[in-house]
Amino acid sequence: ENVLTNIVYLENRDLADNGLQLYEFINCSDALVSDYSSVAIDYLLLDRPLGFTLDDYEAYTESRGWVFDDPLEYMPGEHMYNMQDFENFILDIKNGKDNYKEQRASVRAKTHNVCDNYCQRVLDYFNITM
């Protein structure tokens, strides 16, 4: 078993115990490993690599079900079923390899409305000129 000393594994309780929230750190990351959490959809706005842990995909499908008909279509990143998949994902990140940029853009277009000029649109709405 490899020891990945430069990777920090955090759970919500680790953050909560220290009065912190995940979203305070997300912009500092180079990539995100997630399960089926909606944080992955939010992370699309950063356009950085995503990896999805799917080792319990079948069990999750049977026990909870999905919002989308084809949930894997909405997971635009490395699908990791075992430690080797995880290690490959980390190596790709280390080597600057991004295999899912186009897929992320496609899912981002489906899940996020207009993603530019937010401030200008607010100013326009309130008839504020700068």
Segments the model singles out, each with a brief description of its role:
Residues E1-I41:
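Donor nucleotide-activated moiety binding/catalytic core segment of transferases
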Residues V3-L4, S38-T111:
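Catalytic binding pocket for nucleotide-activated donors in carbohydrate/polymer assembly enzymes
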Residues R13-A16, P76-G77, N113:
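Short N-terminal micro-motifs specific to bacterial/archaeal maturation
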Residues D17-L20, Y81, N117:
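Short coil/turn linker and secondary-structure boundary residues
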Residues C28, D85-N88, R121, Y125:
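Alpha-helical elements of Rossmann-like donor-binding domains used by nucleotide-donor carbohydrate transfer enzymes
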Residues C115-M130:
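C-terminal alpha-helical cap of glycosyltransferases
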